[in-house]
């Protein structure tokens, strides 16, 4: 009976996700067709996981999508999406290469952006090298450069593009792991990851204050516990871990809705993908 209940909940969740996606597509297409304007989004780390699903859903909504990846030639799923959607452009980008970021911003200087989406990052998978007394300090700079400084630099370089857009959103995928309010949920072996997300949150709060005068809303997002590679699902089933996993389609659809509906008065807020405001 318990297994049946879980299946029923999953079916209902998938159904509600599809309804949300269809409504988002309808609204976006109606707005675009009203006066011929096509909204645009710039997405980092679009080759897999959350970034790929963001790309898939925005492209399905008829947006112009500029999707970046460190190795586009090896991003088969992203290339397949581009073949289906003529409005999807793929660009090579390493978010730690500031000269490359500036060059890409210059290349698209005439392209207004409705949403600048900082998604690229090093994941929070536990590692013995992030355990106190066993720390590999050489990893710290990597986490900080990719997860914190990269989004900051991209937000600064593409600020003129966002100012020229209609929706005016800077959205950044963060994590509840970077929240001091969630310190009781600490996962061992994620020290550098959590520190980088805490730094990211504070940087984006400062960005929010700096760009509010341009009517730009800054949004931080917690995607939930999404199993992008299937590993957590397998562990959850085999070890009965009781993890509350989130479907990637539901997480992304929810975050897209949060980005679209966030208000300037709440700029700098971190949201659960469901729209719930979270504490820092």
Residue ranges and their predicted role:
Residues 96-111:
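Conserved Rossmann-fold cofactor-binding substructure of NAD(P)-dependent oxidoreductases
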Residues 61-76:
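Conserved glycine-rich Rossmann-like NAD(P)H-binding loop of the short-chain dehydrogenase/reductase
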Residues 82-99:
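Rossmann-fold cofactor-recognition segment
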Residues 47:
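Conserved glycine-rich cofactor-binding loop
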Residues 213, 220, 233-280:
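C-terminal helical subdomain
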Residues 122-124, 129-144, 163-213, 225:
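Catalytic loop of short-chain dehydrogenase/reductase
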Residues 74, 126, 181-183, 221-236:
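Short beta-loop-alpha junction of Rossmann-like oxidoreductase domains
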């Amino acid at each position: 009976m318990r297994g049946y209940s879980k299946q029923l909940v999953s079916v209902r969740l998938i159904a509600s996700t599809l309804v949300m996606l269809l409504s988002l597509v309808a609204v976006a297409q109606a707005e675009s067709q009203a006066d011929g304007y096509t909204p645009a989004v710039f997405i980092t780390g679009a080759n897999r996981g959350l970034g790929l699903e963001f790309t898939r859903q925005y492209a399905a909504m008829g947006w112009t999508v500029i999707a970046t990846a460190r190795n586009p030639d090896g991003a088969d799923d992203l290339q397949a999406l581009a073949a289906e959607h003529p409005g999807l452009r793929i660009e090579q980008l390493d978010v730690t290469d500031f000269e490359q970021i500036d060059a890409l911003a210059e290349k698209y200087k005439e392209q207004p952006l409705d949403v600048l989406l900082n998604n690229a990052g090093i994941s929070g998978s536990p590692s013995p090298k992030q355990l106190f007394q066993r720390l590999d300090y050489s990893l710290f700079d990597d986490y900080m450069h990719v997860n914190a400084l990269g989004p900051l630099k991209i937000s600064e370089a593409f600020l003129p593009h966002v100012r020229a857009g209609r929706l005016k959103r800077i959205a950044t995928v963060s994590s509840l792991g970077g929240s001091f309010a969630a310190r009781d949920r600490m996962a061992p072996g994620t020290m550098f990851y959590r520190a980088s997300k805490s730094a990211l949150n504070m940087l984006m709060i400062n960005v929010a204050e700096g760009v509010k005068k341009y009517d730009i809303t800054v949004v931080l997002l917690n995607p939930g516990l999404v199993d992008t590679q299937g590993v957590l699902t397998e562990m959850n089933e085999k070890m009965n871990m009781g993890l509350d996993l989130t479907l990637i389609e539901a997480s992304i659809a929810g975050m897209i809705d949060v980005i679209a509906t966030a208000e300037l008065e709440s700029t700098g807020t971190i949201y659960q993908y469901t729209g719930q405001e979270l504490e820092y």
